[in-house]
Amino acid sequence: MPNYNAQNPLYSIFPGDVALAFNNEAPGAGQASQQFALPSYAGFPENGRAIRWQISFATAPTAVSIQLQTAINDVDAQYALPTGAANMSSTLTAGDNSVATGVRANFVRAKVVSITGGSGVTVHILG
C-alpha cells in the first residue's frame, strides 16, 4: 500500500532530476513510496532506460529488502519488478547505489519489502 495520496498530475522525473521516494522516514514492511512518472520523449531507445537509485539509512538495519518497482499504468496492483531489467532490488544494510537498466515503464516507486531495525530510510531516484 502506498504511503502517499494519489496526486494528479504526478511528479515527473526527467533526465537529471532527483526525486526522494523516502526522505529519512520509517516505512514498515510492505510500504511503498510516492509514485513518479517517467515521461517518454522523442528519440527514446526501445531497449529501455537506465534509472540510478540510491539507498541510505540514518541507522543501519540488521536486514532489509527494498525494490524499485515499475508499472505501465499507475495502479497499485500493477507495480512489480520488471522482467528483464537489472539492479531493481537491494538487500545491502549499509545502503546501496545502483543503476537499474532495461526499464520500460511509465511509472516508478520504491517499496520496502522487509526491514528489521534501523531508522531513517532515504531513497533517491535519479531520472
Annotate the PLM regions.
Residues 5, 10, 25-26, 108, ...:
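Residue-level detector of intrinsically disordered/flexible regions characterized by low predicted structural confidence
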Residues 14-21, 51, 55, 110, ...:
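Short beta-strand element of the conserved SAM-dependent methyltransferase core
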Residues 48-55, 101-121:
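Noncatalytic modules at the cell exterior or secretory-pathway interfaces
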